Amino acid sequence: MISCSEEGSNKILVAISLDRDESQNVLSWAINVLAKPSDTVVALHLLVGEEPRKLPMKKKKRTQIRHAKAHVISMLGEFAYTCCHNQVNLEAKVGFSSNIGRGLIDEVKSISAHYLVLSRPTTHEFRIWNDIKRYVSDFAPSSCSVVLVGNQRKPHKDCYSDSAISLDINSEKYSPRSVLNTLSRDSLSSSGDDASSFNGSMVSSSFASPSDKPKHKSISPYKFISSLIMNSPLRKWRGSETKNKPKPQPLIQCFTYNEISKATNDFHQGNIVGIGGYSEVYRGDLWDGRRIAVKRLAKESGDMNKEKEFLTELGIISHVSHPNTALLLGCCVEKGLYLVFRFSENGTLYSALHENENGSLDWPVRYKIAVGVARGLHYLHKRCNHRIIHRDIKSSNVLLGPDYEPQITDFGLAKWLPNKWTHHAVIPVEGTFGYLAPESLMQGTIDEKTDIYAFGILLLEIITGRRPVNPTQKHILLWAKPAMETGNTSELVDPKLQDKYDDQQMNKLVLTASHCVQQSPILRPTMTQVLELLTNGNEAEIAKSWRMPKDMTNDDDDNNEWDDYSMIFGYDVPSDSSF
């Protein structure tokens, strides 16, 4: 047993098979997503047959048990660190049963489990799986919820019951309809508590029988995306203000391919203003004089996950409206996938800090950008109908408007986090090196504190004018740490400012950054507290109650976990590399 806390408040029984990948996935989901601190996860592997009662056992039976125990123990060993970090207890069990379903229910009753987690098999016979699922759904105690995780198949007509929660990972290829259909369902729920994603797949929750499920007519992606946009909570809220008008116009336009092609001069290479991992951004001019930026999914991108990210960005950003988030004008689904934004003449924060040959940003503009990004993140975390975790806050994802008002952009990695969830697990790790929080890099867990860590790095970038990672220099955090510990703010200031800055504002930014970049997520402030720090500095309540956190004052650089980045990747990496 791996124990890191007191007796668990919930017991989670996880049935694991001899399929290692399948078992790793279901255990990872149970530990990182379902379990909360003090919960106990019990990994159970059942051998088919009667439990041997005669001693000594036959050699074949002993070997079978030994192999099963070794398999289960080795599986648990891989999650030891994660369980200790999450304060989750982990136990292993091997049992016998002539009927797998009955064996699972017996164990549920034996340990008084609150959850029974099953993984849909990828290689086993689905008839047996359906029999097991039907049995546990029928006989699970009312105090135990049955959670099914795995590849979605056509549901059996008897597979649904009031005591079962079905979490189906959709394995079909992503398309505008399949991804946006999920996004549309999520957007119309009030809390989002029943939907998320695991291992890069779509996860849904179902409590109804198949007959109760709505039937979707076949519609074109163009019409479907239009309905998604018009049905978003943002559109409903704005529409309520004009409900007396005969026919409100959509706030997001569905462009035709001819319109955006003409605007960008047939996507001429001279109009490219940015190239990302899966997309290209073109400058264009519409017939009515509006200057736009058209984000196009790269033609050579055959990765369905990239298409999913593109569509996820559409689904999320169509629900976002704030002065400090990018304004989506519309989209196009003809001859590819396109997002249309208002063009930002001043480019990105990254280009302004690191590539502007005509001069650097002066201090009032930098301070304005820092506060604006904080307000945008506060909106995403606290003010949206859903909690939105951006997951890729960095200087190249901050656009600068006409008056250098910052706007957070690129929601391709963003997640809607259900209100009742404390964190979320994402496999594989995604984001931009240099901004990734330690818990995200090491364990794949994300929440609001992941964004707050990245925001702290962004503040240091604004203050110092240094890139987070440079092939010839230390990571910006390792470089800045001594000055933050001693309070020598002047050592951090970008030389390009030539000492032309407001001391009080600078101290507020350094103070805020020092709290945001703590290794432990618990020590980091919320975005509400971040705004208070930026406004009131040392007079903020959180500043009065906090001093320089202990994990900022470790002088043993050889053992300091701040150096996790250098231990894993070294410093000789691209300055803006994305996973």
Swiss-Prot record:
Transmembrane segments: none annotated. Its EC number is 2.7.11.1. GO terms for molecular function: ATP binding; protein serine kinase activity; protein serine/threonine kinase activity. Pfam families: Pkinase. InterPro entries: Kinase-like_dom_sf, Prot_kinase_dom, Protein_kinase_ATP_BS, RBK1/2/STUNTED, Rossmann-like_a/b/a_fold, Ser/Thr_kinase_AS. Belongs to the protein kinase superfamily. Ser/Thr protein kinase family. This is Probable receptor-like serine/threonine-protein kinase At5g57670. The active site is at D392. It comes from the Eukaryota. It catalyses: L-seryl-[protein] + ATP = O-phospho-L-seryl-[protein] + ADP + H(+); L-threonyl-[protein] + ATP = O-phospho-L-threonyl-[protein] + ADP + H(+). ATP binds at V273, G274, I275, G276, G277, Y278, S279, E280, V281, K295. The modification Phosphoserine is found at S396. Keywords: ATP-binding, Kinase, Nucleotide-binding, Phosphoprotein, Serine/threonine-protein kinase, Transferase. Residues 267-542 form the Protein kinase domain. The modification Phosphothreonine is found at T256, T432.
